Amino acid sequence: PGALDDVEAGTGQYTTFSLGSNSSDSAVGKDGKGNLNANSNPGKITAVTDSSASGSAWATGTKTYNNAVDVDVYGNPQLNLFELAKAAGKATGNVTTAEIQDATPAVLESHSSERGCYGPQGKTDGSSNDAAKRCLVNQLKENGGIGSISEQLLDTRADVTIGGGSKYFRQTVQGGEYAGKTVWEQAKEMGYQTVENDPAAMNALEYKEGQPVLALMSDGNM
């Protein structure tokens, strides 16, 4: 009993409920005011989640590891909100002031084992060797994978997509039908109404049946 006298009141509860006896898979967390919450989403590997893991939980209902986008801890893609909505015949739209490939908007339209897989060459200029900013080999189109977040965004085909991150659409597709073309060129050939960093062109857009809007208004975040 004496050993517990020096422990701050509440520490036992915090350890038990928030950390789950040192497990990072607890469904209960502690907010900034010290209150226990039953709706937190600690990541699988670490007790502190990031936006990709928490966003994936929100978009798919599946908890996963930090840096993952809509895949489970084994890397298996999980159905997300847009896929469910489109299957039900609903219109979909994704509008953000961030780069459209950023984890929070990306969880609506893509699946990736690495959140930095923004374009075919990753979140880089194509020359970086930083593994955290590149796509995993088995995800690349040239290796039979589902492609980068930008490429998957086109396949998901939301009715309206507006945000930043246009520079990643200038990367070159490496495999499949559109190999050798930029992601922007692929979008146009797939029937998208495209706007790149052009407010006037954005304002001139009109609804056209079967021609989704893809307007990326900044190279990075808006």
Give residue spans per PLM region:
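N-terminal catalytic scaffold of extracellular/periplasmic and nuclease hydrolases
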Residues: 1-207, 211, 218-220
